[in-house]
Amino acid sequence: MKDPALLEQASELFNGTNINITTEGKRHLGAAIGSKEFHEEYSKEKIDKWCNEIKQLAKFAKTQPQAAYAAFIHGEVHRFSYFLRTIPSMGDLLQPLDEAIENHLLPAIMGTNNITQPERNLYSLPIRLGGLGIPILTDIAEQEFSTSVQITAPLAAIMILQGTNLPDPEEVKKTALEVKKLRDNIEKQKEEIVISTLNQGTAKAVEQAKEKISF
């Protein structure tokens, strides 16, 4: 149970059944269910593990930057995204992971000793906007979770009512389009801010990269 205060009431309600009621958190389908404390404990454990993996990947990136970048984009990012979409309020806890990416992985991939903040912001943009698609996780955590809740709301409502029908496909499609439109608007606004902080040469190079991608 998420709220320990309801333990006694729940125990009475399900008395005589085989249902096991606990106030301890549980892991379910790769996410955490339970109290805020359990969420944080579970998340810190995950994040510590990922930080170590990022540092190992950074060592590999010094000699194989393209392979390391591909492994990160097609592997690690998807794991992070699932985590952000299933556990709320993870922004602050993700700071060590962002630091591992910025201080270890990105310098190794780019062949430099350090990454400036304007560069980091640029690399966080989607590839179609001239970036590398390497997100700043603390910046996107809240948005990722809220859009996940929005998309799954129709199914969640049916489950709460113990219904047997799937959500209306048209409703799901409409919600997905709304979420995509919102995401595109946010990315476009961020792009404008990022470009405004770049020097003229870099900004021009970004525009040229976008033109090549669009063909």
Model-derived features with residue positions:
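Short intrinsically disordered, low-complexity segments
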Residues: 14, 65, 71-72, 90, ...
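Short, conserved micro-motifs composed of acidic
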Residues: 1-24
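Charged boundary/loop elements
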Residues: 141-215
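Intrinsic disorder/low-complexity segments
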Residues: 11, 32-33, 101, 204-206, ...
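Non-catalytic, peripheral interaction segments enriched in hydrophobic/basic residues
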Residues: 1-2, 26-160
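Helix-centric, low-specificity signal for extended rod-like, repetitive segments
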Residues: 19-20, 39, 72, 121, ...
